[in-house]
Protein backbone atom coordinates (compact mmCIF):
# COMPACT_ATOMS: atom_id res chain seq x y z
CA UNK A 1 0.00 0.00 0.00
CA UNK A 2 1.04 3.62 -0.59
CA UNK A 3 2.29 5.64 2.34
CA UNK A 4 -0.46 7.34 4.28
CA UNK A 5 -0.78 11.13 4.27
CA UNK A 6 -0.22 12.47 7.77
CA UNK A 7 -3.61 13.48 9.20
CA UNK A 8 -4.08 17.22 9.74
CA UNK A 9 -7.06 16.88 12.06
CA UNK A 10 -8.83 14.34 14.23
CA UNK A 11 -11.39 13.86 11.46
CA UNK A 12 -8.62 13.13 8.96
CA UNK A 13 -7.03 10.72 11.44
CA UNK A 14 -10.35 8.95 11.92
CA UNK A 15 -10.81 8.64 8.15
CA UNK A 16 -7.26 7.29 7.87
CA UNK A 17 -7.98 4.60 10.45
CA UNK A 18 -11.19 3.71 8.64
CA UNK A 19 -9.33 3.49 5.34
CA UNK A 20 -6.74 1.19 6.91
CA UNK A 21 -9.49 -1.05 8.26
CA UNK A 22 -11.03 -1.22 4.79
CA UNK A 23 -7.67 -1.80 3.14
CA UNK A 24 -7.66 1.52 1.25
CA UNK A 25 -5.79 4.80 1.57
CA UNK A 26 -7.01 8.35 1.09
CA UNK A 27 -4.14 9.18 -1.26
CA UNK A 28 -4.58 6.16 -3.56
CA UNK A 29 -5.88 7.24 -6.94
CA UNK A 30 -8.73 5.24 -8.40
CA UNK A 31 -9.50 3.36 -5.19
CA UNK A 32 -12.99 2.38 -4.16
CA UNK A 33 -14.78 5.28 -2.39
CA UNK A 34 -13.88 5.45 1.31
CA UNK A 35 -17.43 4.86 2.57
CA UNK A 36 -19.64 2.81 0.23
CA UNK A 37 -23.34 3.51 0.57
CA UNK A 38 -24.45 0.20 2.14
CA UNK A 39 -23.04 -2.08 4.81
CA UNK A 40 -23.09 -4.97 2.33
CA UNK A 41 -20.91 -3.00 -0.09
CA UNK A 42 -18.56 -1.98 2.69
CA UNK A 43 -18.22 -5.61 3.81
CA UNK A 44 -17.50 -6.77 0.26
CA UNK A 45 -14.93 -4.02 -0.20
CA UNK A 46 -13.18 -4.87 3.07
CA UNK A 47 -13.04 -8.61 2.34
CA UNK A 48 -11.89 -7.98 -1.22
CA UNK A 49 -9.06 -5.67 -0.19
CA UNK A 50 -8.07 -7.89 2.72
CA UNK A 51 -7.82 -11.00 0.55
CA UNK A 52 -5.75 -9.17 -2.06
CA UNK A 53 -3.31 -8.11 0.66
CA UNK A 54 -3.21 -11.64 2.09
CA UNK A 55 -2.54 -13.15 -1.33
CA UNK A 56 0.25 -10.64 -1.86
CA UNK A 57 1.80 -11.58 1.49
CA UNK A 58 1.67 -15.30 0.67
CA UNK A 59 3.22 -14.81 -2.76
CA UNK A 60 6.00 -12.60 -1.35
CA UNK A 61 6.99 -15.36 1.08
CA UNK A 62 6.85 -18.09 -1.58
CA UNK A 63 8.98 -15.97 -3.91
CA UNK A 64 11.49 -15.42 -1.13
CA UNK A 65 11.68 -19.17 -0.46
CA UNK A 66 12.20 -19.90 -4.16
CA UNK A 67 15.01 -17.35 -4.35
CA UNK A 68 16.64 -18.84 -1.27
CA UNK A 69 16.49 -22.36 -2.72
CA UNK A 70 17.91 -21.12 -6.03
CA UNK A 71 20.92 -19.63 -4.25
CA UNK A 72 22.03 -22.95 -2.76
CA UNK A 73 25.17 -24.10 -4.50
CA UNK A 74 24.99 -27.39 -6.35
CA UNK A 75 21.22 -27.45 -6.31
CA UNK A 76 18.93 -28.67 -3.58
CA UNK A 77 16.62 -31.65 -3.71
CA UNK A 78 13.29 -30.60 -2.24
CA UNK A 79 10.74 -32.91 -0.66
CA UNK A 80 6.93 -32.88 -0.50
CA UNK A 81 5.67 -30.90 2.48
CA UNK A 82 2.86 -32.21 4.68
CA UNK A 83 -0.51 -30.72 3.63
CA UNK A 84 -1.56 -29.92 7.20
CA UNK A 85 1.75 -28.14 7.72
CA UNK A 86 1.27 -26.13 4.53
CA UNK A 87 -2.24 -25.15 5.57
CA UNK A 88 -1.02 -23.91 8.94
CA UNK A 89 1.86 -22.13 7.23
CA UNK A 90 -0.50 -20.30 4.87
CA UNK A 91 -2.87 -19.35 7.68
CA UNK A 92 -0.01 -17.78 9.60
CA UNK A 93 1.85 -16.11 6.77
CA UNK A 94 -1.12 -14.46 5.05
CA UNK A 95 -1.25 -11.68 7.63
CA UNK A 96 2.50 -10.99 7.74
CA UNK A 97 3.24 -7.58 6.21
CA UNK A 98 6.63 -6.71 7.78
CA UNK A 99 9.41 -7.23 5.23
CA UNK A 100 11.82 -8.58 7.85
CA UNK A 101 9.27 -11.11 9.09
CA UNK A 102 8.50 -12.22 5.54
CA UNK A 103 12.19 -13.05 5.10
CA UNK A 104 12.05 -15.24 8.20
CA UNK A 105 8.96 -17.06 6.92
CA UNK A 106 10.64 -17.58 3.53
CA UNK A 107 13.53 -19.26 5.33
CA UNK A 108 11.07 -21.49 7.21
CA UNK A 109 9.41 -22.64 3.98
CA UNK A 110 12.71 -23.23 2.20
CA UNK A 111 14.03 -25.17 5.20
CA UNK A 112 10.92 -27.33 5.38
CA UNK A 113 11.12 -28.10 1.66
CA UNK A 114 14.75 -29.17 2.01
CA UNK A 115 14.16 -31.17 5.18
CA UNK A 116 10.55 -31.87 6.18
CA UNK A 117 9.72 -31.59 9.90
CA UNK A 118 12.47 -29.06 10.48
CA UNK A 119 9.83 -26.74 11.90
CA UNK A 120 6.91 -28.01 13.95
CA UNK A 121 3.35 -26.70 13.67
CA UNK A 122 3.74 -25.40 17.24
CA UNK A 123 6.71 -23.37 16.03
CA UNK A 124 4.59 -21.95 13.19
CA UNK A 125 1.91 -20.88 15.65
CA UNK A 126 4.45 -19.14 17.90
CA UNK A 127 6.27 -17.53 15.00
CA UNK A 128 2.95 -16.20 13.70
CA UNK A 129 2.48 -14.27 16.95
CA UNK A 130 5.94 -12.69 16.94
CA UNK A 131 6.39 -9.05 16.03
CA UNK A 132 9.53 -7.56 14.54
CA UNK A 133 10.36 -6.23 18.01
CA UNK A 134 10.08 -9.76 19.44
CA UNK A 135 12.36 -11.06 16.69
CA UNK A 136 14.86 -8.31 17.53
CA UNK A 137 15.13 -9.63 21.11
CA UNK A 138 15.77 -13.16 19.80
CA UNK A 139 18.41 -11.80 17.42
CA UNK A 140 20.05 -9.91 20.29
CA UNK A 141 20.36 -13.06 22.43
CA UNK A 142 21.46 -15.43 19.64
CA UNK A 143 25.18 -14.46 19.81
CA UNK A 144 25.35 -15.64 23.45
CA UNK A 145 24.06 -19.15 22.75
CA UNK A 146 26.15 -22.29 22.26
CA UNK A 147 25.28 -25.77 21.03
CA UNK A 148 26.88 -29.09 21.91
CA UNK A 149 27.63 -31.79 19.34
CA UNK A 150 24.16 -33.28 19.80
CA UNK A 151 22.50 -29.99 18.88
CA UNK A 152 21.41 -28.99 22.40
CA UNK A 153 21.45 -25.19 22.53
CA UNK A 154 22.14 -23.29 25.76
CA UNK A 155 23.35 -20.08 27.37
CA UNK A 156 26.06 -20.72 29.96
CA UNK A 157 25.77 -18.58 33.09
CA UNK A 158 27.48 -18.15 36.46
CA UNK A 159 27.64 -15.71 39.36
CA UNK A 160 28.80 -12.95 37.05
CA UNK A 161 26.59 -9.97 36.25
CA UNK A 162 25.16 -10.84 32.86
CA UNK A 163 23.78 -7.30 32.59
CA UNK A 164 27.24 -6.36 31.34
CA UNK A 165 26.24 -8.20 28.17
CA UNK A 166 22.45 -8.52 28.04
CA UNK A 167 19.42 -7.76 30.16
CA UNK A 168 18.01 -10.63 32.17
CA UNK A 169 14.58 -9.22 31.35
CA UNK A 170 15.23 -10.27 27.75
CA UNK A 171 15.78 -13.84 28.93
CA UNK A 172 12.61 -13.70 31.02
CA UNK A 173 10.75 -12.49 27.94
CA UNK A 174 12.07 -15.42 25.89
CA UNK A 175 11.13 -17.69 28.79
CA UNK A 176 7.56 -16.39 28.63
CA UNK A 177 7.52 -17.14 24.90
CA UNK A 178 8.62 -20.71 25.63
CA UNK A 179 11.98 -20.37 23.89
CA UNK A 180 14.30 -20.83 26.87
CA UNK A 181 14.18 -22.14 30.44
CA UNK A 182 15.69 -19.69 32.93
CA UNK A 183 15.67 -21.80 36.10
CA UNK A 184 18.90 -21.12 37.99
CA UNK A 185 19.17 -24.78 39.03
CA UNK A 186 19.52 -26.22 35.52
CA UNK A 187 22.77 -27.89 34.50
CA UNK A 188 23.86 -29.45 31.24
CA UNK A 189 25.74 -32.65 32.06
CA UNK A 190 28.38 -34.55 30.12
CA UNK A 191 29.50 -38.12 30.86
CA UNK A 192 32.65 -39.82 29.59
CA UNK A 193 33.84 -43.43 29.72
CA UNK A 194 36.44 -42.86 32.42
CA UNK A 195 38.63 -40.39 34.24
CA UNK A 196 41.80 -39.56 32.33
CA UNK A 197 45.10 -37.93 33.17
CA UNK A 198 45.78 -36.27 29.81
CA UNK A 199 42.67 -34.04 29.76
CA UNK A 200 41.39 -35.79 26.65
CA UNK A 201 37.75 -35.81 27.79
CA UNK A 202 36.38 -32.95 25.71
CA UNK A 203 33.20 -30.90 25.77
CA UNK A 204 32.67 -29.43 22.30
CA UNK A 205 30.49 -26.32 21.97
CA UNK A 206 29.89 -24.03 19.02
CA UNK A 207 27.93 -21.13 17.60
CA UNK A 208 28.21 -21.31 13.83
CA UNK A 209 31.86 -21.54 12.81
CA UNK A 210 33.15 -20.51 16.24
CA UNK A 211 33.94 -23.51 18.42
CA UNK A 212 35.04 -24.17 21.99
CA UNK A 213 36.93 -27.18 23.34
CA UNK A 214 36.82 -27.67 27.11
CA UNK A 215 39.27 -30.47 27.93
CA UNK A 216 38.89 -32.22 31.29
CA UNK A 217 40.21 -35.22 33.13
CA UNK A 218 36.91 -35.83 34.93
CA UNK A 219 34.49 -38.59 34.00
CA UNK A 220 31.45 -36.34 34.42
CA UNK A 221 30.94 -32.61 34.42
CA UNK A 222 27.96 -30.25 34.62
CA UNK A 223 27.68 -26.64 33.50
CA UNK A 224 25.01 -24.20 34.77
CA UNK A 225 22.93 -23.14 31.79
CA UNK A 226 19.73 -21.57 30.60
CA UNK A 227 18.46 -24.23 28.24
CA UNK A 228 16.86 -23.50 24.88
CA UNK A 229 13.64 -25.42 24.21
CA UNK A 230 12.89 -27.44 21.07
CA UNK A 231 10.79 -24.58 19.67
CA UNK A 232 13.54 -22.18 20.70
CA UNK A 233 16.11 -24.24 18.80
CA UNK A 234 14.01 -24.07 15.66
CA UNK A 235 13.46 -20.32 15.92
CA UNK A 236 17.08 -19.51 16.83
CA UNK A 237 18.15 -21.47 13.73
CA UNK A 238 16.39 -18.84 11.60
CA UNK A 239 18.69 -16.04 12.76
CA UNK A 240 21.36 -15.39 10.14
CA UNK A 241 24.74 -13.67 10.26
CA UNK A 242 25.15 -14.20 14.00
CA UNK A 243 28.45 -12.89 15.33
CA UNK A 244 29.21 -15.02 18.42
CA UNK A 245 30.08 -13.04 21.55
CA UNK A 246 33.41 -14.67 22.30
CA UNK A 247 34.10 -12.02 24.94
CA UNK A 248 31.10 -13.36 26.85
CA UNK A 249 32.21 -16.97 26.33
CA UNK A 250 35.68 -16.21 27.68
CA UNK A 251 34.44 -14.37 30.74
CA UNK A 252 31.74 -16.90 31.61
CA UNK A 253 33.92 -20.00 31.12
CA UNK A 254 36.70 -18.43 33.17
CA UNK A 255 34.18 -18.22 36.04
CA UNK A 256 33.42 -21.96 35.87
CA UNK A 257 35.16 -24.33 38.25
CA UNK A 258 36.99 -27.13 36.47
CA UNK A 259 40.49 -28.53 36.15
CA UNK A 260 41.58 -28.51 32.55
CA UNK A 261 41.96 -26.16 29.63
CA UNK A 262 39.71 -24.36 27.18
CA UNK A 263 40.42 -23.17 23.65
CA UNK A 264 38.11 -21.13 21.43
CA UNK A 265 38.71 -20.63 17.72
CA UNK A 266 37.28 -20.73 14.23
CA UNK A 267 36.43 -24.29 13.24
CA UNK A 268 38.54 -25.77 10.46
CA UNK A 269 37.32 -29.35 10.96
CA UNK A 270 34.79 -30.93 13.31
CA UNK A 271 37.55 -33.19 14.55
CA UNK A 272 36.77 -36.12 16.82
CA UNK A 273 36.02 -36.82 20.47
CA UNK A 274 39.18 -34.91 21.39
CA UNK A 275 37.74 -31.65 20.09
CA UNK A 276 37.42 -29.35 17.10
CA UNK A 277 40.37 -28.57 14.85
CA UNK A 278 40.78 -24.80 14.67
CA UNK A 279 42.19 -22.56 11.95
CA UNK A 280 43.10 -19.98 14.59
CA UNK A 281 42.77 -19.28 18.29
CA UNK A 282 40.45 -16.59 19.64
CA UNK A 283 41.20 -17.21 23.31
CA UNK A 284 42.48 -19.92 25.64
CA UNK A 285 42.04 -20.57 29.35
CA UNK A 286 44.43 -22.79 31.31
CA UNK A 287 43.15 -24.25 34.59
CA UNK A 288 45.44 -27.25 34.78
CA UNK A 289 47.69 -25.82 37.49
Where are these regions (language model features)?
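Short alpha-helical segments that sit at the start of domains
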Residues: 102-145
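Short amphipathic alpha-helical interaction segments
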Residues: 81, 160-212
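Eukaryotic partner-binding/assembly regions in large regulatory complexes
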Residues: 3-115, 286
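Short, amphipathic alpha-helical interaction segments positioned at domain boundaries
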Residues: 98, 190-252
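Short acidic, hydrophobic short linear motifs in intrinsically disordered regions
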Residues: 140-172
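Non-transmembrane, amphipathic alpha-helical segments
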Residues: 89-93, 122, 126, 159
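Short, solvent-exposed secondary-structure capping/transition elements
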Residues: 117-118, 135, 139, 147-155, ...
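Extended, compositionally biased alpha-helical segments that mediate assembly or anchoring
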Residues: 7, 251-289
Amino acid sequence: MNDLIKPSSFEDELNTIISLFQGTSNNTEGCTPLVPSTIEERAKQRVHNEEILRQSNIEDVIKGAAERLAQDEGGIKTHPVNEDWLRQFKNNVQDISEKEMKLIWSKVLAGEMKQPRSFSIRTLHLLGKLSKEDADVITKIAPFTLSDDSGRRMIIHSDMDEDDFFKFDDLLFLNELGLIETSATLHMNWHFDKNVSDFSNCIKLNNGNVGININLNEKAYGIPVYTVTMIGNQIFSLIEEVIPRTDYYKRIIDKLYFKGKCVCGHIKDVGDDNGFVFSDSIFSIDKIA
